[in-house]
Amino acid sequence: LIHSGDDAAKADLLPGIAAGETIATLAFTEDNGRWDEEGLTATATADGDAWKLNGSKSYVLDGHTASLIIVAARTAAGVSLFAVDGDATGLTRTALSTMDQTRKQARLEYSDVSGTLIGTEGKGWDVLSRVLDLAAVALAAEQVGGGQEVLESAVQYAKDRVQFGRPIGSFQAIKHKCADMLLEVESAKSAAYYAGWCAAELNEELPSVASLAKAYCSEAYFHAAAENIQIHGGIGFTWEHPAHLYFKRAKSSELL
């Protein structure tokens, strides 16, 4: 909405989102899994002053609970963005069961669903490209936070857990693991910080830097989460310990 250039839509929709009264999401990915302009096949057809949307979207975060859905669909002029009410007639929403058990993803099916055009018809892909870059930077920062959390958890457990008469953190094998985790997490921070600067400047480096940051930070997070379980041993493999949650979240973040 912010980058759409549609002042009327911003004035109408942003206050509710900012106040937490409106749960909003972006319906972009389709069954083909493509993240490119030609991969968008859902359609929107003009119907007087309104638009009718048809097609399906998959892996939509909070798609089954959102009260506002921004949908990317193809019109005669190209990819465009539309605001759709979460309870709109003709919209079928199905929650997806995911490995991380958050149940935040959904499949959405549109059958002559009414939507309101946001911004300029045919200019939706330009907006999406920028938004996806900014989202990649935000995800990289989230991955750094997760990596930092599992690093601290592993180090603390290595100090507390005693084996063979001394803390396991005093053994070289564990020290190497913690050192590798620290190296990756700190490197990920640097990548995320630089990507954040590019996002703030909206400079020409943003697309490539955002992709690089997300790729590296996701790998660092997943490796740190896996090593955290290894250092914790048996308890790290139980449902009662949060290590498994970070492991699954780290894996899911690699796919986003």
Regions found by a protein language model. Give the residues of each.
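A short core secondary-structure module
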Residues: 54-92
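Structural signature of FAD isoalloxazine-binding scaffolds in flavoprotein oxidoreductases
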Residues: 36-40, 84, 248
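A short, Trp-centered hydrophobic/proline-enriched beta-strand micro-motif
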Residues: 20-29
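Cytochrome P450 C-terminal beta-domain/meander region
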Residues: 36-54
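Flexible, small-/acidic-enriched active-site or ligand-binding loops
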Residues: 39, 59-60, 86-117
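Short beta-strand-to-turn element immediately C-terminal to the catalytic PLP-Schiff-base lysine
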Residues: 2-5, 45, 71-74, 83-86, ...
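A generic local secondary-structure boundary/capping motif
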Residues: 13-15, 32, 41-43, 57-61, ...
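Alpha-helical interface subdomain recognition
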Residues: 4-9, 16, 20, 46-51, ...
